[in-house]
């Protein structure tokens, strides 16, 4: 029970509680469920945003998944990270052709070796540090809270006291490309005439074009590109009514809580709100509140075989969401 499922559960619990108490928010609140978030959003939030933007008329802020979970600090207080930016994505396929033949014969026009070399160049490329302002603030606050010195060349190692969040934070400091699917051939002694690879590219807001240009340069000649899916990056200001409401709600339920922003290296339904057809956009924040026991490896359970969170963490989340709705 991680991510969107918890967001739905917290929201429904808070809405039900307010309905039973006869309490109405000071302004309209829309509870919208989308399909396809784990795919690409092309048939979910993105489709709705492009085809039915009227659904979002009057909406200025949105709260979705990824964020709001607690981390212990040396002072004894808990820190809660809230997503206020996320990387964009480009899922793409690389294809190449060559000369088919027998595996026992030298073949200088081997599609598999050409593709493998291209994939290796892209996967091993050292992407430059592109620290987004949101990530800069997160790292500065983290260094203060955990008494750390941040090594810009190895952010993940610097943030080791934060556990699995260190990997997430480090991945949010650069563009990244990860090979995920390889397909070629059908028999060990037959050189195939074609080979394909699928890769997952994630870019820091504002750096999409340079990332794609670098990928194509690294691939070299003889490689054809095909886009599988693309989504924009997302940014929301770390200020305003939504941020204030989230902060006050967390601190009301956890005295002394520290709330800080972070850039999500993955994606959420927030990508569907960034570029609405009428020129509007909706500031989207990731906050599924969870007060977790110290030592609970929450992030390592994402998409695992035993996704779970403590019941009292869910109850805490429902109370926080209820308070946020009360300030709406």
Identify the role of each PLM range.
Residues 26, 57-58, 77, 85-91, ...:
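Short, solvent-exposed loop/turn segments at the edges of secondary structure
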Residues 1-8:
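Short, small-residue-biased leader/transition segments that mark boundaries at the very start
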Residues 70-71, 128-189, 193, 205-213, ...:
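An extended, acidic, His-containing surface patch that forms the Zn2+-binding/catalytic region
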Residues 32-41, 65-70, 100, 291:
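Acidic, glycine-rich active-site loops and adjacent beta-strand->loop/helix elements
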Residues 66-68, 78-93, 290-303:
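Flexible glycine/proline-rich, aromatic-decorated loop/lid segments
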């Amino acid at each position: 029970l991680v991510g969107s499922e918890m967001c739905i559960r917290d929201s429904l619990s808070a809405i039900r509680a307010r309905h039973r108490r006869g309490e109405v928010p000071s302004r309209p609140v829309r509870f919208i469920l989308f399909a396809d978030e784990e795919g690409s959003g092309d048939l979910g939030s993105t489709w709705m945003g492009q085809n039915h933007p009227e659904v979002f008329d009057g909406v200025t802020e949105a709260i979705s998944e990824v964020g709001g979970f607690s981390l212990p600090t040396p002072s004894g207080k808990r820190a809660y990270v809230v997503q206020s930016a996320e990387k964009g994505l480009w899922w793409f396929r690389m294809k190449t052709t060559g000369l088919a033949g027998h595996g026992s014969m030298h073949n200088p026009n081997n599609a598999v070796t050409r593709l493998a070399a291209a994939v290796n160049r892209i996967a091993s490329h050292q992407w430059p540090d592109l620290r987004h302002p949101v990530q800069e603030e997160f790292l500065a606050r983290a260094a203060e809270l955990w008494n750390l010195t941040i090594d810009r060349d190895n952010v993940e190692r610097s943030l080791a006291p934060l556990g699995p969040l260190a990997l997430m934070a480090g991945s949010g400091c650069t563009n990244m490309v990860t090979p995920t699917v390889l397909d070629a051939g059908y028999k060990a002694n037959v050189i195939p005439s074609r080979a394909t690879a699928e890769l997952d590219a994630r870019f820091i807001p504002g750096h999409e074009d340079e990332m794609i240009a670098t990928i194509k340069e690294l691939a070299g000649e003889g490689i054809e590109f095909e886009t599988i899916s693309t989504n924009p990056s997302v940014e929301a200001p770390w200020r305003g009514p939504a941020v204030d409401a989230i902060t006050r709600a967390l601190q009301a339920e956890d005295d002394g809580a520290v709330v800080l922003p972070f850039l999500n290296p993955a994606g959420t339904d927030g990508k569907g709100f960034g570029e609405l057809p009428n020129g509007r956009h909706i500031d989207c924040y990731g906050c599924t509140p969870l007060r977790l026991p110290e030592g609970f490896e929450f992030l390592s359970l994402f998409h695992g075989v035993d996704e779970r969170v403590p019941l009292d963490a869910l109850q805490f989340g429902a109370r926080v969401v209820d308070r946020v709705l009360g300030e709406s």
